[in-house]
From Swiss-Prot:
Function: This protein is one of the early assembly proteins of the 50S ribosomal subunit, although it is not seen to bind rRNA by itself. It is important during the early stages of 50S assembly.
Family per record: Belongs to the universal ribosomal protein uL13 family.
Gene assigned in the entry: rplM
Family matches, as InterPro entries: Ribosomal_uL13 (IPR005822), Ribosomal_uL13_bac-type (IPR005823), Ribosomal_uL13_sf (IPR036899)
Protein name as catalogued: Large ribosomal subunit protein uL13
GO MF annotations in UniProt: mRNA binding; structural constituent of ribosome
A single GO BP: translation
Key words of the record: Ribonucleoprotein, Ribosomal protein
Assembly information from the UniProt record: Part of the 50S ribosomal subunit.
Recorded GO CC terms: cytosolic large ribosomal subunit
Classification via Pfam families: Ribosomal_L13
NCBIfam families from the UniProt entry: rplM_bact
Record's signal peptide: none
Length: 150
C-alpha cells in the first residue's frame, strides 16, 4: 500500500499477496467448527487486505484427520453420496466407514462445502493439505501452529 493517506478502497493484486503456512491438529476437534476456520484462512478473510475476487488466503495443513470428532449421532447417521455417472452407480457411505478408509475425505468434503464453487474456490482448495496421521511433508515451509476456536 502507498505511504500517503488514501480514502480509496484497497484491492489486492495476486502478485502482492504474502502467503503463510499454518498447521492445525484435528484431534478431538468438531468437524464443522474446524472446517469453518480452515475455510476462512484459505479465503484470506482473516487478513485486512481481503478482496473477495482475489486469492488472498494462506496454506493450511491439517493433521490427525482420523481423530476428528463428529457431534451428536453423525458418526452413525451421516452419509456421503457419490455417483459414477453410470446408471445405478449411486454410492452411499456412512461417516464411520469413510473415517476408517479415507479420513482425509471427511475434512476435505466439509471444507469444500464452505468455499465458493467456482474457479476461485478450486484454486483455494488446492492450498488445503490433509493428512490422516500426525506427520506431514511440509516442514520445509515452516508452518505456524494454529489453534481452533471452540
Amino acid at each position: 500500500m502507498s505511504k500517503t493517506l488514501s480514502f480509496k478502497t484497497y484491492s489486492a493484486k495476486p502478485g502482492e499477496v504474502e502467503r503463510a503456512w499454518y498447521v492445525i491438529d484435528a484431534e478431538n476437534q468438531v468437524l464443522g467448527r474446524l472446517a469453518a476456520q480452515v475455510a476462512t484462512v484459505l479465503r484470506g478473510k482473516h487478513k485486512p487486505q481481503f478482496t473477495p475476487h482475489v486469492d488472498t488466503g494462506d496454506f493450511v495443513v491439517v493433521t490427525n484427520a482420523g481423530k476428528i470428532a463428529l457431534s451428536g449421532k453423525k458418526h452413525d447417521d451421516k452419509t456421503y453420496f457419490s455417483h459414477s455417472h453410470y446408471p445405478g452407480g449411486a454410492k452411499f457411505e456412512q461417516a464411520k466407514d469413510l473415517l476408517q478408509k479415507k479420513p482425509e475425505k471427511v475434512i476435505e468434503h466439509a471444507v469444500w462445502g464452505m468455499l465458493p464453487h467456482n474457479n476461485l474456490g478450486r484454486q483455494l482448495f488446492k492450498k488445503l493439505k490433509v493428512y490422516a496421521g500426525p506427520e506431514h511433508p511440509h516442514a520445509a515451509q515452516m508452518p505456524v501452529e494454529m489453534k481452533v476456536n471452540q
